[in-house]
């Protein structure tokens, strides 16, 4: 049996809240996160469920692709498609210059490069330093300010290369948005990115 694997980029155009099915206390609703890294993700089971509901397929094709419904009387079998988790690549973060920064870190880029078999050199920022491209809008003097953090800015050609590569993958036919993305792209130290991925994500409240 031949298996075909494909990677896709999911672009959230508005706030996305993938819940965990439980609350923190009586108010806050947490988002799904990877257990080891604590980074936000969209579980593959959630993606598969949405695809099953939204794709315009015949019942037979849907059953072949996704398997029978769990409450179906017929014998159960696995579907022909397996959907992996959607892992975080870019996190938008409030910036004092440029309005918003599109942030990632070397840990995430290493996983992205592995999945796509990319050989580009991955910059690793020094402590308290943010790597930005050569045409960045995020600089304030020699600093960038994200949320309440001030970091030393380091213009870096490898960072510019990654900004352009990801921008073309996200906006293959829109050069204006490719430019917008590359001017706001930043690679953060892993620990700072993890901190912002926990504290700078939107909090939904139970009403």
Task: Label each PLM-derived region with a short phrase.
Residues 1-207:
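Basic, Gly/Ser/Thr-rich N-terminal segments that form RNA-phosphate-binding interfaces in CRISPR RAMP
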């Amino acid at each position: 049996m031949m298996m075909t694997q494909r990677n896709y980029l999911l672009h959230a155009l508005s706030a996305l809240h993938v819940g965990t099915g439980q609350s923190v206390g009586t108010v806050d609703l947490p988002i799904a996160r990877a257990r080891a890294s604590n980074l936000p993700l969209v579980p593959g089971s959630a993606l598969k469920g949405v695809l099953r509901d939204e794709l315009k397929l015949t019942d037979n094709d849907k059953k072949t692709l996704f398997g029978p419904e769990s409450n179906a009387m017929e014998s159960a079998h696995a579907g022909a498609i397996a959907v992996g988790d959607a892992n975080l690549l870019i996190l938008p973060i409030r910036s004092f210059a440029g309005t918003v920064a599109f942030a990632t870190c070397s840990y995430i880029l290493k996983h992205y490069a592995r999945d796509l078999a990319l050989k580009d050199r991955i910059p690793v920022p020094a402590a308290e330093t943010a790597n930005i491209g050569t045409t960045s809008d995020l600089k304030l003097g020699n600093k960038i300010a994200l949320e309440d953090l001030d970091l030393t800015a380091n213009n870096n050609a490898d960072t510019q290369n990654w900004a352009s590569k990801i921008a073309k993958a996200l906006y293959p036919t829109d050069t204006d948005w490719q430019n917008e993305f590359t001017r706001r792209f930043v690679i953060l130290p892993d620990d700072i990115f993890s901190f912002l991925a926990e504290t700078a994500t939107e909090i939904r409240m139970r009403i």
